[in-house]
Amino acid sequence: MLFTKAENLKRLPEGNNLFLREVRLEDSAQIIAWRNDPILGKFLTREKLTLAQQEEFFRKYQARVDDYYFIAEFKRSKKPAASIALANLDFAARQGEVARLIVDPGARLFLAEIFDLLFAFAFEQLGLSVVVAKVQSKNAPAKNFHIRLGFQIEKIAPNAWWNGDDVITFRMSREDYPRLKQAWSALLFDARES
């Protein structure tokens, strides 16, 4: 049974340390700070993002039914840990794409949990079969993390990014997720946020 976007957003997963919630307009300043950070945002964009641009993006996002945009938030402190989205949803093909991932430097230890929450939402709640993630080949930490989680390389598009970098499309299937989650479940520790 398919639910509307509004219904799906009422039933978001929680982990040991984090929960997902839909992004809100008031998150715009934090998202801009992350995106405009020279280290965090270096693989995202070539221009600085303005508050007006982010707010406009948020308004357009709200109208889309093929896009779920989240803030992963710490359960105890309610501090934002990351932004992450499940975008370009194709319900006929039962596929979605990881997008807009930015992890706060203080939350890097929780990256596996952030992905686990997104996978739970994608596979268990939306019933998707496949989640893909596009990563620049020069982004070694992201590339290595996707491999470590068990994503498979689906394809490599040469010179496909705005900076001329190759883009690797990684793939995680609904069938592989439970087995892989068991393999990396040690990364889902019950840490105490600082």
Predicted features along the sequence, with ranges:
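Acyl-donor (CoA/ACP) binding surface of acyl/acetyltransferases
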Residues: 1-28, 34, 76-194
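Alpha-helical elements of Rossmann-like donor-binding domains used by nucleotide-donor carbohydrate transfer enzymes
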Residues: 30, 53-57, 117
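Conserved GNAT-fold acetyl-CoA-binding loop/helix
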Residues: 39-59
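Short, hydrophobic secondary-structure boundary micro-motifs
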Residues: 42-44, 70, 180
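A short helix-loop-beta-strand connector motif used in the catalytic cores of GNAT acetyltransferases and
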Residues: 59-73
